[in-house]
């Protein structure tokens, strides 16, 4: 499944610089707000769903090379976090929906964890 499909179907807002998502295809998903759990459980090329919006999410996402981070519940990263994400090629997306709802929608679209 293409990342652009997920963005369109869930009505996600792209927070970082727009890039061509046409070749990005997440292979799995992971949901957690505890960074140590994310580092242990999230997979390369996956989607990470969290309500965290602080600068450390960029470091973790870059370390794991996730496809994108979906920030839920209208949590908004500050401009410095977005700038850091841009410089590290980390895609940040946002939604007013809860993490539970987002994960259910992604599951409904057919994306599964490995």
Question: What label would you give each PLM region?
Answer:
Residues 1-19:
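N-terminal, charge-rich interaction modules
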Residues 21-24, 33-47, 51-114:
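Feature captures the catalytic cores and cofactor-binding loops of soluble hydro-lyases/lyases
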Residues 27-29:
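Structured beta-strand/loop patches that form or line metal/cofactor-binding pockets in enzymes
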